[in-house]
Curated annotation (Swiss-Prot):
Keywords: Nucleotide-binding. Nucleotide-binding protein. Belongs to the YajQ family. The keyword Nucleotide-binding applies. It comes from the Bacteria. The lineage of its organism: Bacteria, Bacillati, Actinomycetota, Actinomycetes, Micrococcales. NCBIfam families: PRK05412.1. It comes from Clavibacter michiganensis subsp. michiganensis (strain NCPPB 382). This is Nucleotide-binding protein CMM_2802. GO terms for molecular function: nucleotide binding.
Length: 162
């Protein structure tokens, strides 16, 4: 029997992220507590920039964005938030979307699989994803459950289960 496998990836659906940013923008424009504070949200590339006249207002925009991201199925671990900083008369926060599994996290995930996972599981890095293989599908399902409960700084998805 051939080996079964799955891929561990960390990707953000850009359409869902775009929808969440647009919903946040619409809510910021309509809410009374954001009137006359210069509140805005912009998205370019993998960076979302929020602006407002006070630090509290810009944090409130971030909170609205996080709520919309969760409702659209995007985990908060895939957002890297900067600290609020003053720029002229306004405060700004930059949020970056994290995609892909970097080498350090790939090694960390591989170590978790080796140390705590069932015997006979093999993992290897392929670009920005991790391929996990085994002869037993049950072992792969146990590995998925293990990784879902593991403390990893990424929003992990499991794809291509064969």
């Amino acid at each position: 029997m051939a080996d079964s496998s799955f891929d561990v990836v960390s990707k953000v659906d850009r359409m869902e992220a775009d929808n969440a940013v647009h919903q946040t923008q619409k809510e910021v424009e309509q809410r009374y507590d954001f009137k006359n504070v210069g509140a805005s949200i912009e998205w370019s590339g993998d960076t979302i920039l929020m602006k407002a006249s006070s630090e509290e207002r810009v944090k409130a925009i971030l909170d609205v964005l996080q709520t919309k991201m969760i409702k659209r199925g995007i985990g908060l671990k895939s957002l890297e938030e900067g600290e609020p900083f003053a720029s002229g008369k306004e405060y700004r926060i930059e949020v970056t979307l994290k995609q892909g599994i970097d080498q350090a996290n790939a090694k960390k995930i591989g170590k978790i699989i080796r140390d705590e996972g069932p015997k006979g599981i093999k993992s290897r890095v392929e670009g920005d994803e991790l391929r996990v293989s085994s002869k037993s599908r049950d072992d792969l399902q146990q590995t998925i459950a293990l990784l879902k409960g593991a403390d990893v700084d990424l929003d992990l998805q499991f794809v291509n289960f064969r």
